[in-house]
Amino acid sequence: MPAPLIDRALLEKLERLTIHWQKSLPGLVGGHNTSRFAGAGQEFLDHRHFHQGDDLRAVNWRAFLRLDKLFLKMFQLEPRIPVRILLDISKSMETGKDGNKFDYARKLAAAMCYVGLVRLDSICLQPFSDQLGDAFLASGGRHRFQQAATFLTNLKIGGATNFFGAARDFISKFPQRGLVIVISDFLDDADCEKPLQYLSDFGHELILTQVWADEDREPPWDGELDLEDAETGQHVELAFDSNARAQYTAAFDEYAQHLRHVALRNRGRYVGIPTSVPVEEALFGPLVRSGAIE
């Protein structure tokens, strides 16, 4: 049996977090997801663990008497913005010396999915490469998380990256505006700016999560090289030395800054995460600092 994507200890820590959106969309609730707890006459949907600072009025005291543990009752107050996680499963995500980018990316996707489900968000896990794969849809609480985790565990890498085609098909498949979290290395022969702008123009709020292996940014190679493109199979021969490495790293950083500017220009957010950073540290560090979760 494969190891779980997210262990139980981290899941409990994730219950403190909320996926945060900045836009207020007509007919849907925007901003902080804090209105989901106690409220007389509201529809009960789920429980979560009590954390310091939570409202004691929302505690299920009957559960406390039976289990000697504090749980908060959660209620659905209004329709919520859909949270859609676009997960890159193209061949380039297979690279990475210490665990590939794909394994790392789907752990991030699992964590974001759990945060959303605990807060009663409507979640869509949408894999893509040169086209959209089958999606997983869930809402209504943490009891759906195991199904989501199984879905992510069973995903297979394949295909080249076609951001524009994936974005076009995504808009057609999910016309309702919402929050789109893209988890990818963003390595596409075509410029990623146009498809990201396309998503924003249709009213979606963007959170761009770029993951890379250390060797993506600072290749350890030296000498005469014959490199093969992981997605197309094309070969290129080149000489690589410390000067070429410095130029390459500078170009990589410039591209990351370009993605950041694309996100900010469209009132979205960007976070870049090397896979050498532990997943828990990435969640409570860069992703929290970016405002994607809080």
What are these regions (language model features)?
Residues F136-T150, V288:
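Short, electropositive alpha-helical surface patch
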Residues R62, K156-A160, S184:
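Short, flexible loop segments at the rims of nucleotide/cofactor-binding pockets, characterized by
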Residues M1-R36, S172-G178, D188-E294:
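Von Willebrand factor type A / integrin I
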Residues M1-S139, L179-I183, D189-A190, K194, ...:
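An amphipathic, basic-hydrophobic helix/alpha-beta surface used to engage anionic
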Residues D103, I157-F164, A250-D253:
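Conserved phosphate-coordination/catalytic loops
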Residues K107, A111, T161-R168, Q257, ...:
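Short, contiguous clusters of charged residues that form electrostatic/catalytic patches at enzyme active sites
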Residues R144-G178, A190, W212-A213, R217:
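Von Willebrand factor
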